[in-house]
Amino acid sequence: MGKFALNLNAELTGVKNLAPKDEESFYYAFKVQCSGCREIHDNAIEISRSETHSIPGSKGEANLIWTCKNCRKTCSFVIEGPFSPYNDSQETKKVLVLECRGCELVEFIPQGEWIANGAESNTLFDEIVLEDDWYDYDENASSEVSITNLEWSISKA
């Protein structure tokens, strides 16, 4: 069993509280490495806290049960706690913790829609895509806002 932290470091200009748009139904995408055969799989897995599955041979549940296509080892993933909104521009911060059994997280793939608030105006920006740098204009604060230099990392929690 291993607990992994998803960490974020980004430059926020004029925005705060960066988080998934709808955390309950949001799908986090990761590349994984099987702890049995050590294969890093090409296809990403997607995990949502809204899904629960029974763990085979156990009384427990997980957000995702996945089987390695090479060695057939069964792996389980549990999202622990809520996403912690990112506010600390240019500071690495743990934003999510996952418990993984049978495999390890090796890369986060940002996808889906994210939200943030204007730092001065509290304007809601609710269609942020983080596949690249993001820029917009906060009309209430009369200033440009942006999220740039995103660096996602995974560490032991």
UniProtKB/Swiss-Prot annotation:
Q: Which InterPro entries match?
A: CXXC_Zn-binding_euk
Q: What is known of its domains?
A: Requires a bound zinc ion for normal folding and solubility.
A Pfam short name: CXXC_Zn-b_euk
User: Domain of life here?
Assistant: Eukaryota
GO cellular component: a single term: cytosol
Q: Which organism is it from?
A: Schizosaccharomyces pombe (strain 972 / ATCC 24843)
- According to the record, what happens upon gene knockout? No obvious growth defects. No increased sensitivity to oxidative stress caused by exposure to hydrogen peroxide (in vitro).
Protein family per UniProt: Belongs to the UPF0587 family.
Q: Which UniProt keywords apply?
A: Metal-binding, Zinc
- Sites binding Zn(2+) sit at C34, C37, C68, C71
Name of the protein in question: UPF0587 protein C2D10.03c
Any one Gene Ontology MF annotation carried by this entry is:
zinc ion binding
